[in-house]
Design a protein with these regions (language model features):
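Conserved N-terminal structural module of periplasmic/extracytoplasmic solute-binding proteins
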Residues: 2-107, 302, 324-325, 341, ...
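Extracytoplasmic/periplasmic substrate-binding proteins
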Residues: 45, 64, 209-212, 240-322, ...
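Periplasmic-binding protein-like
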Residues: 55, 156, 330-353
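Extracytoplasmic "Venus flytrap"/periplasmic binding protein-like
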Residues: 62, 66-128, 135, 142, ...
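Helix-loop-helix "hinge/cap" segment bordering the ligand-binding cleft or interdomain interface
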Residues: 65, 134-208, 219-258, 318, ...
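A structural signal for short loop-to-beta-strand junctions that line the ligand-binding cleft
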Residues: 90, 98, 124-159, 193, ...
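Hinge/lid segment of periplasmic solute-binding proteins
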Residues: 102-153, 206-209, 213, 294-296, ...
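Long, aromatic- and glycine/proline-rich binding clefts that accommodate carbohydrate-like moieties
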Residues: 296, 344-394, 426-431
Length: 431
């Protein structure tokens, strides 16, 4: 079995096992057959996201109307649920378009599969939020217009009634303070479970939401020194301590083993006192609660607050026959006004300070500026390894098992063993 086909098979299987994320596929040996010398195609997962799709189409239209455009860019949008299948099919046939979007943590997998090429942009990316720049093996393969940030939300009036202080960037809650806050809030008798951490979530939510807590305890998904083994970091003492704490939130009645389908709406309906969510919920919560809403950093569980970094990003395929034009478009799209337009349409954190300055909510002193600070201060990139889709799947299974009452050590040992076997079977995912 040749090396490229082995990589294709490994990345496609990993993708299929991780619901809700993008998987990898084969190197595109040519750009889409519909492309000509003066036209390049760009694929996006945003067919079901009209606001973001329109913002992207507006950027493309502005570029196409520019006298400096090196080619016309044609947008083709897919529903997110079918986007991965479309990419896999096109890559297998050698018909990938020139530009694709991809969920940030999966970029190394795509690069390893040899169908993304390193970016060569005229734009300086050093001022971008680090989580919006995807790298692997020392090279940059994708860049995003925005990120999102995890946080905790509560009503100031509830915290005051319970005698609990508001956590801040300067002084986040410690594990002991979090325990005390939950105990006092539960004692008010207003909620069956004062904490909602979205435990009904599936797919990428599981590693995105819960691995930062593991990291704050001192564990991790994989040893980042070479990314060759999860043994000792995913199933070591600190990781087992995290798992026991996580299940303990259920055992103590602080949170449900399986939350409702819409945790944000449940919080707004006063079914919980503290909501663990992301910046995407801020505008809706602010509109409903006004000045009673407080946004707080995640808990310092021993090694500082941690949140997951990276959202959807853009890359250029290896088979693109007009890579110069593709790179030129991406460089153009990274202008502050374009970043601001997309971030404003999606309610996300703009990738640069210059773009943030164009959005009142994210400018200095703006209501949502705190999320940008969370991202800069707390974001941890999900492991930048081609093994990530498999790692994410195995961690997700372990997290769900722990929530269901499984032995923490056993659940984490099982995940670590599977991850190590996968890495070994793929030759360490070396370039």
């Amino acid at each position: 079995m040749n090396k490229r086909f082995t990589r294709v098979l490994a990345t496609s299987l990993a993708a299929a096992s991780l619901l809700g994320t993008l998987g990898a596929c084969s190197k595109g040996s040519a750009s889409s057959s519909s492309e000509g010398a003066n036209e390049i195609t760009m694929w996006t997962h945003n067919a079901g996201n009209p606001e973001e799709l329109k913002a992207i189409e507006d950027v493309v239209a502005a570029y196409n109307s520019s006298s400096d455009a090196k080619a016309k860019v044609k947008v083709q949008a897919f529903p997110q649920d079918s986007y991965n299948d479309s990419v896999v099919s096109a890559a297998s046939a050698g018909n990938l378009p020139c530009i694709v979007d991809i969920d940030g943590p999966n970029v190394p997998n795509w690069a390893w599969a040899e169908y993304l090429q390193p970016l060569n942009l005229s734009t300086d990316l050093t001022s971008n939020l680090p989580s919006t720049v995807a790298k692997w093996d020392g090279e940059t393969y994708a860049v995003g217009y925005y990120d999102v940030a995890l946080a905790m939300m509560a009503r100031a009036s509830d915290l005051k009634a319970a005698g609990v202080r508001v956590a801040t960037i300067e002084e986040p809650w410690t594990a002991a303070e979090f325990q005390d806050a939950l105990t006092k809030l539960k004692a008010l008798g207003k909620w069956e479970h004062p904490l909602d951490m979205g435990t009904a979530g599936t797919g990428e939510w599981l590693p995105y939401a819960y691995s930062p807590m593991l990291q704050s305890f001192g564990g991790d998904l994989v040893n980042r020194d070479g990314f060759q083994s999860a043994d000792g970091v995913l199933n070591g003492d600190k990781a087992v301590e995290w798992a026991g704490w996580f299940r303990g939130l259920v055992d103590q009645g602080f949170m449900a083993q399986k939350s409702g389908k819409d945790s944000t709406q449940d919080f707004l309906n006063n079914k919980s006192a503290i909501l663990y969510t992301g910046s995407w919920a801020a505008d809706k919560a602010k509109a409903a609660l006004g000045d009673d809403l407080v946004v707080m950093p995640t808990v310092d569980l021993g090694n500082g607050p941690k949140i997951g970094g990276a959202s959807w990003q853009w890359g250029v395929t290896s088979g693109c026959e007009n890579a110069e034009a593709a790179m030129d478009y991406l460089s153009y799209s990274l202008k502050p006004e374009n970043l601001a337009a997309v971030a404003k349409a999606t309610g996300t954190i703009p990738a640069t300070n210059d773009a943030a300055a164009l959005i009142p909510a994210f400018a200095e002193g703006g209501a949502n500026r705190i999320f940008m600070e969370f991202s800069r201060n707390y974001a941890v990139m999900r492991p930048e390894t081609p093994a990530y889709p498999f790692i994410a799947t195995e961690f997700g299974k372990a997290a769900q098992d722990v929530l269901a009452g499984a032995d923490p050590q056993g659940a984490l040992d099982k995940a670590a063993k599977a991850i190590d076997a996968n890495i070994k079977s793929n030759g360490g995912y070396q370039k």
